[in-house]
């Protein structure tokens, strides 16, 4: 059931993504065109504070035109492991670092057209450790009990897929 690339053309190279158009050979002998968004892997972190609350960030997301509640997350830089990327995102987005960081697993964000792999971590035993946030991020930090998180997922208040997946993996 695999497809084999016959031709590949990069049509866009940006700071965060690249886009290529591939012609592939199908298992049935046919051909198809696949548009692929190339995206670096990302770390998604579910931080739990000393009171047992989940720490999330609220930030405006231009592509969807609204403010979303999300787990701290971001691209893993070329010189980073998923763990170091997760720690950096925690420091940039919520001002803490985790003394205990446990890998929960990974998933493909949107495998129908994108190769982004999300690595999910549970962060506990948090200690203050601030890094400067990215210049283009405007983030509010909020805390919620696990029961509040479960209710917010059920009622659709948390709309970001990576956050829903990471929270369900963690709690």
Each language-model region and where it sits:
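Conserved Nudix-box catalytic region and its N-terminal flanking loop in Nudix hydrolases
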Residues: 2, 34-39, 43-88, 135
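Short clusters of small/polar residues that mark proteolytic maturation junctions
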Residues: 21, 35-36, 59, 108, ...
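Short loop segments at secondary-structure junctions
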Residues: 27-28, 49-51, 60, 123-128, ...
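Unchanged
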Residues: 32, 41-44, 75-161
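C-terminal boundary of histidine-terminating zinc-finger modules
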Residues: 167
């Amino acid at each position: 059931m695999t497809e084999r690339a016959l031709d590949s053309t990069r049509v866009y190279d940006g700071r965060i993504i690249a886009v290529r158009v591939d012609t592939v050979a199908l298992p049935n002998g046919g051909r198809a065109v696949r548009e692929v968004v190339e995206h670096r892997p990302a770390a998604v972190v579910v931080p739990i504070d000393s009171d047992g609350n989940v720490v999330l960030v609220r930030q405006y997301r231009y592509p969807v035109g609204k403010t979303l509640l999300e787990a701290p997350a971001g691209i893993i830089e070329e010189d980073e492991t998923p763990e170091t990327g997760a720690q950096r995102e925690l420091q940039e987005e919520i001002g803490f670092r985790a003394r205990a960081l446990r890998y929960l697993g990974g998933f493909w964000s949107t495998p129908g057209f994108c190769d982004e792999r999300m690595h999910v971590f549970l962060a506990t035993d948090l200690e203050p450790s601030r890094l400067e946030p990215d210049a283009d991020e405007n983030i509010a930090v909020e805390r919620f009990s696990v029961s509040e998180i479960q209710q917010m997922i059920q009622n659709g208040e948390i709309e970001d897929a990576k956050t829903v997946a990471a929270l369900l993996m963690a709690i």
